[in-house]
C-alpha cells in the first residue's frame, strides 16, 4: 500500500512538472545588453543585480517561472521588471504588465517609456479608458506581435486581447486581483508564460 502511495505522489509530482514546463529563454540579446550598457540611467544595486541573475536563470531553465519581487516603493522593482521584459523580447516573445488601477498602469507606462525612449521597442498602454479608435489600432498590433510590451489594467484579460506570443506576465499588487482574473492572464498563451509578481514590502 505504501508503495502505491509513493507511486501516486511521484506521478503527481511528474504531472506538476509537465504542467509547469515553461518557455525557454536561452539568450541575453541586443535589447537587454544595449539597454544595460548604454541607457541604464544608474548602476543597479547588488540586490537588483542578484534578482536579475535569478530571473535570467529561471527563464532559461525550461520550467515556468513564478517569482515574487518584493520591495519598498521606490526600491527599483519596475526597473527589474523592465529588464525581465527585455529578456522576453530578446527571445522573440511579448511581455505584459498588469496593474490594479489606471493611475498605477499609467505611471508604469510613463516610467517604461522614459527608460526606452531611445530604443526601438513598441510599447502600448491598454486600460478601460483607452479610446475605441486607439484600441482598434492596439489590439491588432498585439495580435501580430508588432507591439512587444503591453502595460495595462484588467483590460489585458478581456477576450478581445490576443497575444502573438506572450512569454512573460508581470502582475503588480497581485492581492488586488482575484484568482480567476490572474488565471485568465495565464491562458493568453498556449504555453503558460513566466510570471513575475511585484508587491510592496509589508509594514510590520
Task: List PLM regions with ranges.
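Conserved helix-turn-beta segment of the N-terminal RecA-like "Helicase ATP-binding" lobe
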Residues: 104-143
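Post-DEXD/H (motif II) to motif III coupling segment of the RecA-like Helicase ATP-binding lobe
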Residues: 106, 162-168, 174-204
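Conserved motor-coupling elements within RecA-like helicase/translocase cores
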Residues: 129-150, 157-166
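Loop/turn-to-beta-strand initiation segments
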Residues: 92-96, 122, 145-149, 165-168, ...
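Walker B catalytic acidic pair
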Residues: 153-154, 172-173
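Conserved H-loop
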Residues: 100, 107, 128, 154, ...
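Conserved RecA-like ASCE P-loop NTPase motor core of nucleic-acid helicases/translocases
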Residues: 94-101, 126
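Pre-Walker A segment
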Residues: 1-96
Amino acid at each position: 500500500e505504501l508503495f502505491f502511495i509513493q507511486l501516486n505522489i511521484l506521478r503527481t509530482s511528474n504531472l506538476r512538472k509537465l504542467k509547469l514546463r515553461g518557455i525557454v529563454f536561452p539568450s541575453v540579446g541586443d535589447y537587454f545588453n544595449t539597454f544595460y550598457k548604454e541607457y541604464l540611467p544608474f548602476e543597479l544595486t547588488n540586490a537588483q543585480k542578484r534578482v536579475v541573475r535569478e530571473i535570467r536563470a529561471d527563464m532559461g531553465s525550461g520550467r515556468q517561472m513564478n517569482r515574487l519581487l518584493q520591495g519598498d516603493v521606490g526600491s527599483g522593482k519596475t526597473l527589474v521588471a523592465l529588464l525581465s521584459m527585455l529578456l522576453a523580447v530578446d527571445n522573440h516573445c511579448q511581455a505584459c504588465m498588469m496593474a490594479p488601477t489606471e493611475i498605477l498602469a499609467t505611471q508604469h507606462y510613463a516610467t517604461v517609456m522614459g527608460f526606452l525612449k531611445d530604443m526601438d521597442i513598441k510599447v502600448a498602454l491598454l486600460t478601460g479608458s483607452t479610446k475605441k479608435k486607439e484600441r482598434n489600432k492596439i489590439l491588432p498590433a498585439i495580435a501580430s506581435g508588432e507591439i512587444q510590451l503591453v502595460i495595462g489594467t484588467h483590460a489585458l484579460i478581456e477576450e478581445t486581447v490576443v497575444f502573438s506570443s506572450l512569454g512573460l506576465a508581470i502582475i503588480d499588487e497581485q492581492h488586488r486581483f482575484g484568482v480567476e482574473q490572474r488565471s485568465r492572464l495565464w491562458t493568453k498563451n498556449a504555453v503558460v508564460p513566466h510570471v513575475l509578481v511585484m508587491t510592496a514590502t509589508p509594514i510590520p
